């Protein structure tokens, strides 16, 4: 039975299957690409945290939800010998954030209506303490993704990858536009993915130059 059909039955999830919730083409690419010498930073913890921890040298995992972070931490403690810490960076209440555009990298807000009036500025900026060109891969699959992109793009080393899930969403157009040109190579992994009946798009950009292309 194809993996897609298997994933649609029962109670399977990315968390129970210990995989990132990306399209199947992206999952195959990541499985083939990751290796033990890599440093990875991820916005959004879960099945991807196990997946990366089992395959790379260093992992920094950022999570905004305290209940979910505790669940992931407990599962890592029990089931993962190479247990990375999950760093909890909660959003902060901000009345001005209610008027911000989730497509604006300077907005620091989520497109999820349940987070209206909350700012993810500290969450997006959690990568700022690392040197430029430090990570082999930055995985953006959490909140306020355009803002996370703004802070993380310069942290990808030459030859490294920046991966954005759900890249087809209109409010991520800034990311696509910012990485056009000779400094980055785009890898488009559109198609089906586990646990969903619909197709979506996961994109990876490989940094080809020592310059990130950002101002």
Label every PLM stretch briefly.
Residues 40, 61, 139, 163-164:
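Generic enzyme active-site microenvironment
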Residues 24-97:
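SAM cofactor-binding core of SAM-dependent methyltransferases
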Residues 127-137, 143-215:
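C-terminal substrate-binding/active-site "lid" region of AdoMet-derived donor-dependent transferases
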Residues 1-37, 107-119:
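Class I SAM-dependent methyltransferase Rossmann-like catalytic core
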Residues 43, 64, 142, 166-167:
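Generic detector of well-ordered alpha-helical packing
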Residues 19-23, 45, 142-145, 194-195:
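Aromatic-acidic/polar surface patches that form glycan- and anion
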Residues 24-28, 50, 121-125, 133, ...:
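Short, contiguous clusters of charged residues that form electrostatic/catalytic patches at enzyme active sites
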Residues 73-132:
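S-adenosyl-L-methionine
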């Amino acid at each position: 039975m194809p993996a897609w059909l298997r994933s649609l039955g029962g109670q399977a999830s990315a968390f129970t299957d210990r995989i990132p919730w990306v399209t199947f083409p992206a999952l195959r690419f990541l499985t083939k690409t990751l290796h033990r010498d890599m440093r990875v930073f991820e916005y959004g913890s879960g099945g991807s945290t196990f997946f990366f921890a089992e395959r790379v040298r260093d992992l920094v995992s950022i999570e905004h939800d305290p209940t979910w972070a505790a669940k992931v931490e407990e599962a890592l403690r029990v089931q993962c010998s190479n247990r990375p810490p999950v760093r909890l960076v909660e959003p902060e209440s901000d009345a001005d954030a209610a008027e911000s555009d989730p497509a604006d990298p300077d907005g620091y807000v989520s497109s999820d209506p349940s987070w209206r009036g909350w700012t993810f500025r500290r969450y997006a900026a959690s990568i700022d303490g690392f040197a430029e060109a430090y990570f082999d891969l930055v995985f953006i699959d959490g909140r306020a993704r355009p803002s996370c992109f703004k802070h993380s793009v310069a942290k990808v080393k030459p030859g490294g990858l920046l991966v954005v899930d759900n890249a087809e969403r209109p409010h991520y157009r800034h990311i696509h536009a910012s990485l056009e040109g000779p400094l980055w190579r785009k890898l488009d992994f559109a198609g089906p993915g586990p646990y969903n009946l619909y197709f979506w798009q996961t994109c990876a950009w490989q940094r080809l130059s020592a310059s990130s292309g950002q101002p």
